[in-house]
A protein has these predicted regions:
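P-loop NTPase catalytic nucleotide-binding module
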Residues: 1-20, 39, 75, 93-95, ...
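P-loop NTPase switch module centered on the Walker A-proximal segment
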Residues: 2-79, 91-127, 133, 174-176, ...
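Intrinsically disordered, low-complexity tandem-repeat regions enriched in Proline and Serine
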Residues: 81-86
Length: 209
């Protein structure tokens, strides 16, 4: 697939099987980047992107939606939220302009979801730690591979009782790809830190990247 990313503008899509927590993640991203002032919830029928009456009544995403996030490099999420207005006028070399596409998770609306894949630079595939890899998850993975979309896997609900990070990681490797790596592991941080001096400085200071 031809690379669509230009300069500091990227398009990402959020995909998931139903009830994986995709809308919750979208709300958190919008809130942490200062695009919304309060977190909406599906069960409260006030999620920012699920603004269609049918979506709010049924508690699912039916239509693909988009939102723009301005993310300033070198700041954490809290700083970005507090300085959202400044970020919009900051030096563009230090700000990523992200178009986020929220897609339907229900299998009945797969055609609506698939239409977005051809315009993505990256995808975030949300998986519930309590449900694991579902049939629809495998379908999404195959489609992302077909359209050659680089994909980050976000494992949601890891704070739920009975979840096991090692078990989830093993399932991702066996069901999706043995190339799935845990970006929170200490070994990975150490390996990445050796790739550049700024990363090494950050790792030595905070122990994370």
């Amino acid at each position: 697939m031809e690379q669509k990313m230009t300069n500091n503008h990227i398009t990402i899509g959020i995909l998931a099987h139903v009830d994986a927590g995709k809308t919750t993640l979208s709300e958190a991203m919008l809130y942490s980047t200062g695009q919304i002032r309060s977190l909406g919830r599906v069960d409260h029928q006030d999620a920012y992107l699920d603004n269609d009456a049918q979506e709010r009544e049924r508690g699912i995403t039916i239509f693909s939606k988009q939102a723009r996030l301005d993310i300033s490099c070198g700041t954490n999420a809290a700083d970005t939220a507090r300085t959202a207005d400044v970020a919009r006028t900051a030096d563009t070399a230090r700000t990523w302009h992200v178009v986020m596409l929220d897609t339907p998770g229900h299998v009945d609306f797969s055609a609506e979801m698939e239409r977005t894949l051809q315009v993505l630079d990256y995808a975030i595939l949300v998986i519930s730690a309590t449900d694991g890899v579902q049939g629809h998850t495998r379908t999404l993975w195959r489609l992302l591979k077909h359209y050659n979309v680089p994909t980050f896997i976000f494992v949601n609900k890891m704070d739920m009782q009975g979840t096991d990070a090692e078990k989830v990681q093993a399932e991702l490797r066996s069901e999706l790809s043995d190339g799935c790596v845990d970006f929170s592991s200490q070994d990975l941080f150490e390996e990445l830190a050796m790739c550049s001096e700024p990363l090494l400085d950050e790792f030595m200071e905070s122990g994370e990247l």
